[in-house]
């Protein structure tokens, strides 16, 4: 569980280390605001993305299910600055086992609300889906802009990083994987 008081003290000291006066008018409530913001932004730390799949149904559906353009934001664990973008999730049900569509978005939400790497985020979403449904195939694609590349260092705003995880049929069958990519890329 996050310790808000400890976070506030650390942020206060950080402002002092910058040469700022944390007690001045514009900054006096900043340690509290920043601590509350980080508690919200890292609220996925004590949650398991797999636990978001609370609704699993047996349906007579054996074709692909795709939810795309799921917006998310996360925090780069290397610099503690945001990266944000869209997640696309596809799965091929096994024995008609499907989940509520919002559960896919909830899994992305939980996995992204922690200090994170995009590669790990992609894998965690795929693993949660695999654990919950054991589908015949899984394909997760995440496209994101990283503020650590936009605001600092190389300073390349607008550049996107794309990560994918393919499992089951979508890993083993190149044709099936290409079909999923085509469906995701359609407007």
Curated annotation (Swiss-Prot):
Q: Locate the transmembrane regions by residue number.
A: none
Q: Which SUPFAM superfamilies match?
A: Tetrahydrobiopterin biosynthesis enzymes-like
Which reactions fall under this protein's catalytic activity? GTP + H2O = 7,8-dihydroneopterin 3'-triphosphate + formate + H(+)
Origin organism is Streptococcus agalactiae serotype Ia (strain ATCC 27591 / A909 / CDC SS700)
What EC designation does it have? 3.5.4.16
The record's InterPro entries line, in alphabetical order, gives: GTP-CH-I_C/QueF (IPR043133), GTP-CH-I_N (IPR043134), GTP_CycHdrlase_I (IPR001474), GTP_CycHdrlase_I_CS (IPR018234), GTP_CycHdrlase_I_dom (IPR020602)
The answer to whether the entry has keyword Metal-binding is yes
Which pathway does the UniProt entry assign to this protein? Cofactor biosynthesis; 7,8-dihydroneopterin triphosphate biosynthesis; 7,8-dihydroneopterin triphosphate from GTP: step 1/1
Cysteines joined through disulfide linkages: none
A single Gene Ontology CC term: cytoplasm
**BP terms from Gene Ontology:** one-carbon metabolic process; tetrahydrobiopterin biosynthetic process; tetrahydrofolate biosynthetic process
Name the domain of life.
Bacteria
Tell me the residue numbers annotated for binding Zn(2+). Answer: 76, 79, 148
Q: Could you tell me which Gene3D superfamilies the record lists for this protein?
A: 1.10.286.10, 3.30.1130.10
**Assembly notes:** Toroid-shaped homodecamer, composed of two pentamers of five dimers.
Please name the HAMAP family in this protein's record.
FolE (MF_00223)
Instruction: Give the protein's recorded name.
Output: GTP cyclohydrolase 1
Q: Tell me the keywords, alphabetical order.
A: GTP-binding, Hydrolase, Metal-binding, Nucleotide-binding, One-carbon metabolism, Zinc
Regarding protein family, the annotation reads: Belongs to the GTP cyclohydrolase I family.
PROSITE patterns in alphabetical order: GTP_CYCLOHYDROL_1_1 (PS00859), GTP_CYCLOHYDROL_1_2 (PS00860)
**Metal-binding is among the record's keywords:** yes
Q: Which PANTHER family match?
A: GTP CYCLOHYDROLASE 1 (PTHR11109:SF7), GTP CYCLOHYDROLASE I (PTHR11109)
Spell out the molecular function terms from Gene Ontology.
GTP binding; GTP cyclohydrolase I activity; zinc ion binding
């Amino acid at each position: 569980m996050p310790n808000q008081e400890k976070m506030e003290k650390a942020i206060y000291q950080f402002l002092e280390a910058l040469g700022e006066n944390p007690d001045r008018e514009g900054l006096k409530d900043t340690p509290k605001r920043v601590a509350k913001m980080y508690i919200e932004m890292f609220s996925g730390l004590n949650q398991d993305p797999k636990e978001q799949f609370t609704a699993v149904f047996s349906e007579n559906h054996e074709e692909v299910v795709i939810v795309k353009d799921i917006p998310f934001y996360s925090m780069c664990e290397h610099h503690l600055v945001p990266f944000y973008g869209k997640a696309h999730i596809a799965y091929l049900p096994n024995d008609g086992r499907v989940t509520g569509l919002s559960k896919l978005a909830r899994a992305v939400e939980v996995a992204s609300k922690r200090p994170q790497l995009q590669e790990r985020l992609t894998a965690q979403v795929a693993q949660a889906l695999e654990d919950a449904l054991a589908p015949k195939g899984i394909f997760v694609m995440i496209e994101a802009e990283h503020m650590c590349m936009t605001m600092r260092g190389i300073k390349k705003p607008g550049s996107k990083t794309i990560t994918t995880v393919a499992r089951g049929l979508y890993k083993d069958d190149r044709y099936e994987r290409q079909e999923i990519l085509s469906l995701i890329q359609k407007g």
